[in-house]
Amino acid sequence: MELNIISGCTESQVNKVVKVTRITVAAVRNEKYMFVKQRGKGTMELPGTQVVEGENTAKALRRVLEGMLGVTEHAAQFVCPYSVTDGKDVQYGILYRAEITAMGTFPHSGLVGVYYLDTPPEDNDKWSFPETDKLLFEEAFRK
């Protein structure tokens, strides 16, 4: 898979030009980075989801933060759009950065749990999607 960060584009512009199918959230709480583990996986990843038909990216972001993670207070901001190519298909996503200030009860979702780390995992074997998530993480916290 190949990740391409798309620069110089606003959130409203990207939503008008391409069909966004995924959102990814690089989150921090109490100066620690948030990662999640999916059921059945022993690796970590950035929180994210597919944008379902009829849903806009703002609703998908809220679904991730509130519905999947149990976040009750946050400040989220658009970072950039990105594309992921698997050799034949291209999918577009939006990267957000979120400052989490309050958490509620962890909902029953497809996640095993939420993990807070001082630094991102160094070893690629600890990431579910090292070819994309590591670069998205770096982009989110570079700015």
Regions found by a protein language model. Give the residues of each.
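Acidic, metal-coordinating catalytic segment for phosphate/diphosphate chemistry
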Residues: 1-24
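A generic fold-level signal
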Residues: 18-20, 28, 88-91, 109
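Conserved Nudix-box catalytic region and its N-terminal flanking loop in Nudix hydrolases
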Residues: 28-68
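Short loop segments at secondary-structure junctions
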Residues: 30-32, 99-104, 119-120
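A short coil-to-beta-strand element that immediately follows conserved catalytic motifs
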Residues: 71-80
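Short helix-capping/turn motifs at alpha-helix boundaries
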Residues: 81, 94-97, 124-131
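Active-site-adjacent beta-strand/loop module that shapes the phosphate/pyrophosphate-binding cleft
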Residues: 82-106
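Nudix hydrolase/Nudix homology domain
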Residues: 107-143
